[in-house]
Every structure is written in structure tokens, then in C-alpha cells.
Amino acid sequence: MTAKVYVSGFGVFSAFGFGPEALFDGVFSGSPAFRMVTRFDVSHCRTGQAATYPEAAVSPPDAGPGLETVEVAIACGRQAIEMAGWRDPAELPVVLATKVRAPSVEPESPAEITERVADRLGLGRPRRTFVNACCAATNAIIHGAQLVRAGVTDAVLAGGAFLVDRQAFNLFDSAQALAADGQLRPFDQDRQGVLLGDGGAMLLLESGESIRARAAQPLVRLASWAMTNDAFHVAQPHAQGAGVAAAVTAALQRSGISPDQLTYINAHATGTPLNDAAEAAGLHTALGRHTEQVFVSGTKSTTGHALEASGALEAVITLLAMRSSTLPPTAGLRRPDTRHPLRHVSVPERVEVPYALSLNSSVGGVNAAILLAAA
Amino acid sequence: MTTLPAFELVTSAEVHAGPELPQLPGFMVSDFAPLAYAAVRECVGDARSGHLLKGIGDRGGIILGSQRFDTVTLELSVEHVNRGRVSPILFYQVVPTAVLGQIARDYRLTGPVSCVAVTGDARDEVLELARLLLADQGAEWVLGLTVKLDPDPAKAFATADLVRIAPGPADRKES
């Protein structure tokens, strides 16, 4: 006996601010949130641009001076609990994706960050912390969903939080991964690389039985999920996107959904030459002739790459697309890469979305896919 | 609430840092990745010869647990950033999934790969995650790894456990 898993609430943060309205206004209008970084020195870097929140404009409830990752996770968690109408946080386990940093710059360990978030929100156990880079938040959501589906818990809070910091920015700069032109243009022939962005999201995942018992309303169903590895290279994706294809195929098969039923894919789409090409090739392998029917967008073009938190942020964007029947565009896409053509969303489109995928990939060949279905 | 099904611990290994720890090309600044890789080799056999993971492919997952992961490389990256000159190789070496990508490549494992940070016993937590992954049918075999670095390099160690779904009565009769 396995439980169906639904999303019954969420909280979200990005450079556009806290809450779904700010995110929708920015992402779904295709407005990039990139600006000059002021929280540390970037004068020696290829670019000074990142999607950082304007510090004066954002003040989450009970945040102290200067926004921290913990405050983002707490604010998003509180939003999710309130939206779901969940009464007792102590009944909720938590699964958080966060960064790994040197003790000299971050005395608190990653799991201690989760403990602090959980203590502040009065959450229960288990309290788990995923740190597998750009797939960490997707993994956190998948793990939370596994807890619900296996009947370990009725509901769980899962997601991630990330704020652009000096360490991440300089490491990406050193690898020449940042876009020197200050634009993140996924799938464009002229793409120059990635740009980082603040982001966070927490989703309240809940069994169908629990939702019925509470007379609550589900937002979407988390129909299936899959994680794979390229088994190819420590730092580069498989050129033909083998792991992406396997993750998409497995997620579809486990849900019983065929490629022609899929409407929308929120791609990982970092704007780097290798990643986007591999991802597009992988989508062709997985979807075959249906690739040309499925809408694809890369919303990091507006939010930037929230690294460990990106999977949660993009799951919420995908959820908003389904709930609003509006597809968010890939900003700055002028000359689409023609090697593996996709059906790009270049302007906001009104489309009914019964099924949608959110994809992420990370260093080490890790790939993760979650399939959302209309509730 | 449900109790997750049992799993079978197929084999385990523990390796310690020291002069005999083999180097791992591409990971030269810290013992973290060489320890993880050596624990896998000790547990399941060398990737270039007969090993226990042969043919497992997408049915095999990896979970790595640690408290602070590769603090040596992380601290080195801080030094580089403070000096204003960062080595590009640190870009991937600070990421915990990088060595798992190498293990997955060498042993041809194409299933799920996770990294979990812990406050307590990393091995217990990794095995608990493995139990859930097996129950969810995300994998049939899981390689559970832990790495603990220490200010005294001789005290650094890694563990590897290969687990699988506990065989049912029919499976036990056959074996």
C-alpha cells in the first residue's frame, strides 16, 4: 500500500521577493532579476551580475539584520504551513537542501542549519539535509515524497534555500562558468554561461488521505520522480544527455504517463554551452517525436541559478504554471540552438498544463526529475 | 505509521587515511575523495576487475553521508578566494557529488546519487536513507558511504556498505 503525494502548500523566495505573487510577476513576464552584486567585491570577476534581492525591499517576518539562508528557509516554511492550513508543525518532518561551506566561513554545519530552521518553526523529526549541489532541493523533495508514499509520515516540509555568497561566486568565476555578458540565455546559440541567484522554496507534501481527512485542497499531485547518474565524468555532463534521458523516461514510466501527455518542462537550463546541449539531446532521446510538442523553458534566465535551492524554486514555478495555465518564458532567447531543437517558450503563453516536469542536473553527473500532475 | 522493510547488508568496509591510501587522480589536495573511493574498492572490489557491482547499472544507487564533507578542500578554496586567485579545479573538487561521479563512472552505476549532511552517526543516517530508497524501488542495491576527516589526518576514515532489499523466502530457498 503506497500513498499518493500532493503539494498542499508552499512558500517561495527569489530575487523578486517573498511569496508567489512577486515570483509570478517577475518570472512569468520574462523579466530578468540580475543586478550588480553589492554584498561582496566582484570587481575582479568576469561579471558582477547576479539575481540578488534588493536588501532594503525585502524583510521576512522575524528576520534580523541582514537576510540569512536560515531566515529564507524559515519564512518559506512558515508560508507553506499557513497556505496548507497545517495546524501542528511538530507533526512535520523536514528535509532541507543547503550549501556546504568551510567551517572558517560558516561555523554552523549544514545539518545544524536544518536543526535551527526546524527548531524555529517547531517542526518534528526526522530532520534531513541534502547537499548534492544543484540537485539537492529536488532530492529533498523526492526524499520527502518517499517518506509520504512509504507511509512513514502523513506530511513533510521539503525544499531548499540559497543566497548568493562570495565563495560560490568566486568558484564559478574561476571556472569561467559565469556569463561575461551579464545575461543568462539558456538554449541560445550565443549563451555565455550561468549567473547565480538568490532563491528558496519549501513545499508541504501530504498524502491524499491526510488531505481528505483535513478537508484541505491539494494544489498539484507529485505524480512521480526519478534520479539517475550519467556515469560519465566528474564535472561534465554526458554529451548526449544519457542521464537526463533516463531520468525523464523513468519519471514518465513510473507514473504511467506517455510523452504525448506531457505539456511542459522546466529545464535545468543553466545557459552553459555543455549543459544546455546535453539536456536538449537527452530530451530528444526520452521524448522522441513528441519533443516538438512539449513546451520547454529555462527560468534561470530570470531568477538566476539558486544552486542547492534551484530544484525547489523551479518546482514552485512549475506548480504556478500549472495552476495559472500560463507558461513562463526563457528570457533573452533570440537565436535558439538548432542542434537539438526544442519548442521554446519565448513569450508567456496561455496553455492548460495537466502534466509537467521539472529537471535538474549537477556536478558528478547527477540528474533529477519530478513530474507534477494537476490535482 | 509504516515500518520500512528490512534490507540485507551484503558487505562492508572501513579504510583509514595514511601513507598507504592510494591517490585519486583529479583529487590531489585532500584525503576526502581518495578515502571515499578506497572504501568502495575495499567493499566491492576493484572497478577494473571482477567486482560486486558488475551489471547493476541503473538498479544501483549511491548515498554519501558526512558532517562537514571535504573541509580541507573547502578551506583551501577560502584561502584562494581571499588571495584573489582561485584554481579552477576547486570548482568541482569542493562539490561532494564530484567523487561520486567518478565512482559511478568507474563502476557503471547509473541509479540515484545523494549526499546527506548529518549531525550524528553518518552511517546510521545513510543506511536509513538507503532503506527508504529501496522501499521506494528507486534502487535494488545501494552503496552507502561515509567520510570523516580529522585535524589529525591519521584519524580520518571512510566506510562503505553495500545493501540490498532483503531476499524473500523464495530467494532464500534458491540461494
Residue ranges of model-derived segments:
Chain B
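Conserved "HGTGT" condensation-loop signature of ketosynthase/thiolase-family condensing enzymes
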Residues: 1-175
